[in-house]
């Protein structure tokens, strides 16, 4: 009944597409524009997310944060109120960067892989977390001194009781101590294995105290998180900023070089700038042509051709110098911009990371200890524990190899100056100017400046 009461469109009434009045044309055009905009947005989203793997893990959603203050200290309101807008801006970017790292990498690790882990790998990961929870050692050592006093008092009581025993027991004790020491040398503890393999090859518990382990793990882990932020946020932002400054100078150099090439091609096509072979033939027939052509105009033409040949040799050199200067400016500006951004970040966020973020992160990890997500997160965070120090001697050997390779390259080049066929290509070194141009063009394409 309700449908029957609605007014029906007359059969001869024109539709929106058929009507040619201004109102209908305007409505039709706006409708088509909306459809095109919607299709364009869908295509853009497909290009942006089509090849990206869907994340199956979210740190804030899939971890147990009960009895922790992690969600509080990472909230925007808390950060703005305690640290202000400027500092909280850097802190929020850091937290998002770490969450993104964890979410992406944990999503790549399957439960089957976690279940197949060697138990000793899990013991190592848990030991790293326990070591990190000591916060560098000072608080631990404050509690440790009282325990050492009690242990010393108990050891004195035991020594008084044991003093009544015979010489045989004393000899057996000394022998047992020697066996324990030799056993430790043959079979290092788990802590010794971790430190020797990842941080310090010469580490032993007899020469380094626990404070060294706690401080090394704490400093390495914090520095690892900061350096990850440097690589993923500061460096790309600094490169984009520098490329934005150098984009116009680069395009100006390229356009000048293209114009120069076009002029050279036109001059050769018009016959004004003959090739070297043609110019030699012209010189051979000079005596015959001088009698026919005007000598003055011929001299002017030859002078202009010489100037053009000279320009053909000098202009590329000038452009090459400009490209070298552009590359040097890129290197200098990038380094300065990265240092400035890193200093700003450290001044704004280092205190928060050390005093609030890391302790809260440790609490969250302990709250989820034993679950598959816990082992996945620890596998992702493990490289940060060994960020600063490498196993001794690797860097020195690499530097020696670089120096030797550079010396070999110079000797090979000096040997093959005259013989072009014998040039050794395996020592090819990319031109930094080309690398700079590629980097600027890559950033320009990504930012849609081109």
From Swiss-Prot:
<feature type="compositionally biased region" description="Acidic residues">
    <location>
        <begin position="395"/>
        <end position="411"/>
    </location>
</feature>
<dbReference type="GO" id="GO:0005829">
    <property type="term" value="C:cytosol"/>
</dbReference>
<feature type="region of interest" description="Disordered">
    <location>
        <begin position="395"/>
        <end position="416"/>
    </location>
</feature>
<protein>
    <recommendedName>
        <fullName>Uncharacterized protein YKL075C</fullName>
    </recommendedName>
</protein>
<feature type="region of interest" description="Disordered">
    <location>
        <begin position="141"/>
        <end position="171"/>
    </location>
</feature>
<feature type="region of interest" description="Disordered">
    <location>
        <begin position="276"/>
        <end position="298"/>
    </location>
</feature>
<feature type="compositionally biased region" description="Basic and acidic residues">
    <location>
        <begin position="141"/>
        <end position="151"/>
    </location>
</feature>
<dbReference type="GO" id="GO:0005737">
    <property type="term" value="C:cytoplasm"/>
</dbReference>
<dbReference type="GO" id="GO:0009410">
    <property type="term" value="P:response to xenobiotic stimulus"/>
</dbReference>
<feature type="compositionally biased region" description="Basic and acidic residues">
    <location>
        <begin position="283"/>
        <end position="298"/>
    </location>
</feature>
<dbReference type="GO" id="GO:0009081">
    <property type="term" value="P:branched-chain amino acid metabolic process"/>
</dbReference>
<feature type="compositionally biased region" description="Polar residues">
    <location>
        <begin position="152"/>
        <end position="171"/>
    </location>
</feature>
């Amino acid at each position: 009944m309700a449908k029957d009461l609605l007014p029906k469109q007359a059969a001869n009434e024109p539709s929106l597409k058929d009507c040619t009045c201004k109102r209908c044309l305007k409505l039709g055009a706006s409708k088509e524009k909306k459809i095109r905009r919607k299709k364009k947005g869908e295509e853009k989203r497909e290009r942006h997310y089509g090849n990206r793997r869907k994340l199956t893990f979210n740190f804030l959603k899939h971890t147990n944060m009960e009895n922790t203050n992690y969600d509080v200290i990472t909230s925007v309101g808390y950060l703005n109120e305690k640290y202000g807008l400027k500092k909280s801006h850097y802190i929020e970017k850091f937290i998002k960067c770490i969450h993104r790292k964890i979410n992406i990498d944990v999503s790549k690790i399957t439960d089957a892989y976690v279940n197949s882990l060697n138990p000793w790998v899990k013991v190592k990961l848990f030991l790293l977390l326990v070591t990190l929870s000591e916060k560098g050692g000072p608080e631990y050592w404050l509690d440790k001194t009282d325990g050492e006093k009690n242990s010393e008092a108990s050891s004195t009581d035991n020594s008084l009781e044991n003093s009544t025993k015979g010489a045989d027991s004393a000899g057996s004790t000394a022998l047992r101590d020697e066996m324990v020491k030799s056993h430790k040398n043959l079979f290092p503890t788990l802590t010794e294995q971790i430190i020797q393999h990842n941080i310090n090859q010469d580490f032993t518990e007899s020469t380094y105290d626990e404070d060294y382990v706690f401080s090394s793990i704490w400093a390495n882990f914090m520095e690892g998180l900061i350096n990850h932020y440097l690589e993923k946020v500061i460096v790309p932002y600094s490169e984009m900023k520098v490329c934005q400054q150098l984009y116009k100078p680069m395009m100006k150099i390229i356009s000048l070089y293209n114009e120069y090439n076009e002029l050279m091609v036109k001059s050769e096509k018009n016959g004004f700038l003959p090739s070297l072979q043609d110019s030699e033939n012209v010189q051979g027939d000079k005596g015959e042509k001088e009698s026919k052509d005007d000598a003055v105009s011929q001299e002017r033409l030859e002078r202009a051709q010489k100037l053009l040949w000279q320009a053909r040799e000098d202009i590329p050199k000038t452009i090459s110098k400009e490209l070298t200067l552009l590359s040097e400016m890129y290197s200098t500006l990038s380094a300065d911009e990265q240092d400035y951004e890193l200093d700003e970040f450290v001044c704004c966020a280092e205190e928060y990371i050390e005093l609030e973020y890391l302790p809260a992160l440790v609490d969250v990890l302990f709250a989820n200890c034993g679950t598959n997500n816990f082992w996945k997160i620890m596998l992702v965070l493990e490289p940060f524990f060994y960020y600063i120090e490498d196993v001794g001697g690797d860097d020195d050997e690499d530097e020696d190899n670089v120096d030797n390779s550079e010396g070999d390259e110079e000797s090979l080049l000096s040997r093959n100056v005259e013989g072009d066929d014998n040039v050794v290509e395996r020592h090819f070194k990319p031109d930094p100017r080309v690398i700079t141009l590629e980097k600027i063009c890559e950033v320009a394409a990504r930012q849609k400046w081109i």
